[in-house]
């Protein structure tokens, strides 16, 4: 009887040990979504969405490319999967295991802006006539302010740096102005909007909102 009890006890200990061993080996996996704000040769800087827990650790993460990732474009939204803890230096660093490009959000905004331009009155060059002709689509863009601002402002900056300023850029500037009411300015062109907004962001203004903070990250 004692021998049987001893054997049962050993079996329990072995099973418990195996269970603990299995638990210890379980990977500590996390993920978050954010926006690319800087592209480098072997890494990129990503700003987590404010709704993500990681944002409480840092507003910037240095993400090393993995699995041959080569689609870094400022303004794109990505999902980052990582293992272990956050190294809270600045920018924060993590052990990245996977990078996924969330292109649907960007494509939706791009398609709607292009639709406004393509369906506008042929005889008019007035941006407000184009918006009036596709008011429903324009309002849909305003209904998703964060997505729209991220794409529109990123594209504005890229166009500005390439000395480009067209009807699409003007509509993007209008969207940014309507979404971010923290900066109010009656601009004459998309380039004019970008230049004056950059001046505003360089001031010591104490009440920058989330759109201003995102814009400052893009401009760094």
Please identify what each model-predicted range represents:
Residues 1-4, 9:
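Positively charged n-region of N-terminal signal peptides that target proteins for export
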Residues 54-71:
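Beta-strand/loop nucleic-acid-binding surfaces
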């Amino acid at each position: 009887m004692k021998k049987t009890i001893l054997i049962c006890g050993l079996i329990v200990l072995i099973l418990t040990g195996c269970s603990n061993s299995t638990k210890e080996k379980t990977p500590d996996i996390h993920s978050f979504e954010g926006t690319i704000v800087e592209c480098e040769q072997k890494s990129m800087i990503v700003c987590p969405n404010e709704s993500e827990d990681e944002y409480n650790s840092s507003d910037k993460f240095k993400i090393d490319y993995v699995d041959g990732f080569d689609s870094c474009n400022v303004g794109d939204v990505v999902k980052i999967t990582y293992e272990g803890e956050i190294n809270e230096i600045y920018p924060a660093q993590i052990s990245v295991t996977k990078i996924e490009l969330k292109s649907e959000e960007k494509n939706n905004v791009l398609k709607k802006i292009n639709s406004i331009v393509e369906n506008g009155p042929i005889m008019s060059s007035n941006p407000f006539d184009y918006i009036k002709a596709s008011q429903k689509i324009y309002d849909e863009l305003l209904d998703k302010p964060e997505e729209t601002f991220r794409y529109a402002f990123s594209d504005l900056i890229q166009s500005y740096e390439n000395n480009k300023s067209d009807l699409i850029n003007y509509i993007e500037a209008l969207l940014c102005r309507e979404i971010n009411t923290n900066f109010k300015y009656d601009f004459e062109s998309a380039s004019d909007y970008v230049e004056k907004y950059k001046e505003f962001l360089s001031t010591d203004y104490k009440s920058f909102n989330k759109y201003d903070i995102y814009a400052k990250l893009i401009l760094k």
